[in-house]
């Protein structure tokens, strides 16, 4: 199964995360399929940069976000766009 999850970057005591698409059997910091953005929780306010179009594309293909990434993507407005696309597809099929 393909997951959207965080991979840790940065120095000791200064975490920085990439939001990546990865096979769930891979290691946390292992090879990934595609990078969707990054998240820096240390800055005040935190920095969240997500390529919304890529994230929507992967979710529509069936990629499952982890709990933390799901919350971050919700803050970035990704799921609103996914819901709109699903509604338009349902209307087209009728």
UniProtKB/Swiss-Prot annotation:
This is Small ribosomal subunit protein bS16. It comes from Thermosipho africanus (strain TCF52B). It holds the Pfam family Ribosomal_S16. Belongs to the bacterial ribosomal protein bS16 family. The keyword Ribonucleoprotein applies. One of its GO terms (cellular component) is small ribosomal subunit. The keyword DNA damage does not apply. GO terms for biological process: translation. The gene is rpsP. Keywords: Ribonucleoprotein, Ribosomal protein.
């Amino acid at each position: 199964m393909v997951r959207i999850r965080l991979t840790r970057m940065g120095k000791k005591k200064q975490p920085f995360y990439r939001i990546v698409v990865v096979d769930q059997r891979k290691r946390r910091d292992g090879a990934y399929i595609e990078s969707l953005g990054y998240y820096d929780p240390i800055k005040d306010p935190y920095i969240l940069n997500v390529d919304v179009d890529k994230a929507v594309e992967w979710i529509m293909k069936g990629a499952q976000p982890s709990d933390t990434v799901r919350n971050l993507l919700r803050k970035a407005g990704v799921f609103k766009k996914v819901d709109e696309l699903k509604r338009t597809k349902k209307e087209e099929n009728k």
